[in-house]
Amino acid sequence: MAPARLFALLLFFVGGVAESIRETEVIDPQDLLEGRYFSGALPDDEDVVGPGQESDDFELSGSGDLDDLEDSMIGPEVVHPLVPLDNHIPERAGSGSQVPTEPKKLEENEVIPKRISPVEESEDVSNKVSMSSTVQGSNIFERTEVLAALIVGGIVGILFAVFLILLLMYRMKKKDEGSYDLGKKPIYKKAPTNEFYA
């Protein structure tokens, strides 16, 4: 049983490594920007043909075809990546980078801060967080969530009590009708407890 588990673990590990290698493959971002591939319609690995490669290069029929390719290669080929591997993002002068110069647009763009009361001006406002559990000087019943919870809890409790009373009344009524015959003999008999001395 142990070799089967080891083999299954090995297959799982190889599948995970293959998937992580596949995730690191590079897709040309220019193709995505030009709109060749839409959402989910990325090219398949077999369909991608690099420059200088033709589809005939990959169609080898079997033994003997590989020898012809080795003879035509003179030296080691240096593979240059098609996409530069830097992370530089070019600055574009688009509509998002325009700074408004007209006074009317500047006024519309302003963010007006909230007014701070004179008592709170001395405190550090950036770290002040209003939490419902830290509110001081307020009654617990003034908060709406507490009132809602109390009302819902009361309604559920009253319904539970009503159903319990109805169940008890139903059982008492059934008992009065005689459906429970207490004078009935039991199905089993108790074994005699006589002791015999030998």
Curated annotation (Swiss-Prot):
Q: Which keywords belong to this entry?
A: Glycoprotein, Heparan sulfate, Membrane, Proteoglycan, Secreted, Signal, Transmembrane, Transmembrane helix
PTM details?
Shedding is enhanced by a number of factors such as heparanase, thrombin or EGF. Also by stress and wound healing. PMA-mediated shedding is inhibited by TIMP3.
UniProt record, GO biological process? cell migration; inner ear receptor cell stereocilium organization; negative regulation of T cell proliferation; neural tube closure; positive regulation of exosomal secretion; positive regulation of extracellular exosome assembly; positive regulation of focal adhesion assembly; positive regulation of stress fiber assembly
What does the record list as coiled-coil region(s)?
none
The chain's Cytoplasmic topological domains, given as residue ranges, are 171-198
Where in the sequence is the signal peptide annotated? 1-18
Tissue specificity here reads:
Detected in fibroblasts (at protein level). Also expressed in epithelial cells.
Secreted as a keyword of this entry, yes or no, is: yes
Residue intervals on the Extracellular side:
19-145
Task: Write down any Gene Ontology CC term.
Answer: lysosomal lumen
Entry-linked InterPro entries: Neurexin-like, Syndecan, Syndecan/Neurexin_dom, Syndecan_CS
SUBUNIT field: Homodimer. Interacts (via its cytoplasmic domain) with GIPC (via its PDZ domain). Interacts (via its cytoplasmic domain) with NUDT16L1. Interacts with CDCP1 and SDCBP. Interacts with DNM2; this interaction is markedly enhanced at focal ahesion site upon induction of focal adhesions and stress-fiber formation.
Family membership, please give it. Belongs to the syndecan proteoglycan family.
Recorded protein name is Syndecan-4
Question: Taxonomy-wise, where does this protein's organism fall, top ranks first?
Answer: Eukaryota, Metazoa, Chordata, Craniata, Vertebrata
